[in-house]
Amino acid sequence: MKRVFAILTVIALSPAMSLAEGHDLFSNKFFSTITSEEMMEGKTGHIHHATNDSLWDWTDAPDGWPKANSAKCHLSNVLSDEKKPLFGVWFCESIDPDGDVSLWSGSWNVAEKSSIGQLVGGTGKYTNAGPRKCNLKTLVRISDTQKLHECVAIK
């Protein structure tokens, strides 16, 4: 199950990709630590749920945005009967160092090799941010529960 989660984490966690009003997308790295996970067994497939704490490195963020942010993320993933990842949804909630609140959501699909995320809503600088796309990959697998990822903007 931990290998499945490693794959799902890479596919699903693109909320660290941001679009600031009047700015282009910016790429970033993020570190995730699993805090809980659960597998619900079905006959023809399974549902994997996980929660993680993420630290987002926004070094290339536009002026006025913090250079780092943290979030709690929740993932619900559909697996085949052989426990291979198929698709899923995620959402992340965050209060940044400036006190601005944001809620992010998205979906991913293995067949399409995609993860699409958007800002559901927020306050302050997040009020006018919009949807974004990025390519995700794992840079370092530190342990079964900790990974460093990269989210590269698709412009």
Which role fits each region the language model picked out?
Residues 21-155:
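Beta-strand-enriched cores of mature, soluble protein domains
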Residues 4-14:
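Sec-dependent N-terminal signal peptides
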Residues 15-21:
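Sec/Tat signal peptide C-region and signal peptidase I cleavage site
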